[in-house]
Amino acid sequence: MRLFFALDLPPATARAVTLWRERNPIAAGRPVPAANLHLTLAFLGELEERQLEPLCEATDAQLASRTPGAARLALDCVGYWPRPGVFWLGSTQAPPPALQALARGLQQLGGRF
C-alpha cells in the first residue's frame, strides 16, 4: 500500500480551496473531496502490511516528543503532476521552522521502513 504522512487542512482553509477550485474548474481529473484535502509532509511509497505496526509505533514515539502548535503557510502557487494526474497547491515561501522539522523527522522515520 502507498503511504504518506500528512496534516489535515483547517476547515476554513479547506472551504477556501474548495471555493477556489469551483471558480477555476480544471478539465482533467476528479476533484478531491474537501474532507480529504491535506498537506503532505512525507511520502513513504509502497509499504507492506507487516510494516504498519512498527511504523505506527515509531511514529507515536517521535510525535510524543514534539509540542503541537499552529503553523501558517500561504498557498500561493499551483502545479500539476502528469503521473498520477494530480493538481496541487503549494507555497513559494519556506515553511515555518517547526513544520520543516516535523516533515524532516517524518521523512527520516519513513526512510527506515
Name each model feature, range by range.
Residues 1-113:
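Histidine-dependent nucleotide/RNA phosphoesterase domain, centered on the 2H-phosphoesterase fold
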